[in-house]
């Protein structure tokens, strides 16, 4: 289990790409966050307290220079290389001048035939979350 302590320290608007599921960034920053995910079930699982929108990270419908921060919290690992490139280009497009891109992800050496899983013990100011993120793929 990998320990990870997160404390709120950013001001301004935050776009959380792949922010469904546990909704870690949304839990941490609340109404500052708009989380997008291309899986409605993941958005439905995310807790309340922040805005959730079904959207493809490779084709965002937000205007340019919209957000102070864009986060990818263990979400790039679910995209193929070309989609990663497109999602990062879109993130750059929607960042305000001087905005910040924040990435948390895993270096995956092999995810086939056994799945690659990173287990996290996430400490937020008001709660602790035990979770894991993983992939199975013969192409990493």
Residue positions per predicted region:
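Conserved alpha-helix/loop element of class I SAM-dependent methyltransferases that forms part
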Residues: 1-12
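A short SAM/SAH-binding and catalytic strip from SAM-dependent methyltransferases
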Residues: 69-82
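Class I SAM-dependent methyltransferase SAM/SAH-binding core
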Residues: 15, 20-59
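Conserved class I S-adenosyl-L-methionine
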Residues: 102-127
């Amino acid at each position: 289990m990998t320990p990870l302590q997160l404390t709120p320290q950013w001001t301004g608007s935050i776009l959380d790409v792949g922010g469904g599921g546990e909704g870690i960034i949304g839990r941490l920053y609340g109404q500052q966050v708009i989380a997008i995910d291309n899986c409605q079930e993941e958005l439905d699982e995310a807790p309340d307290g922040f805005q959730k929108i079904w959207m493809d990270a490779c084709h965002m419908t937000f205007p340019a220079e919209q957000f102070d921060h864009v986060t990818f919290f263990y979400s790039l690992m679910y995209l193929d290389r070309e989609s990663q490139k497109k999602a990062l280009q879109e993130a750059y497009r929607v960042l305000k001048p001087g905005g910040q891109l924040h990435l948390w992800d895993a270096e995956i050496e092999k995810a086939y035939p056994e799945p690659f899983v990173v287990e996290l013990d996430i400490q937020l100011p008001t709660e602790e979350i035990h979770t894991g993120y993983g992939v199975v793929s013969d192409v990493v």
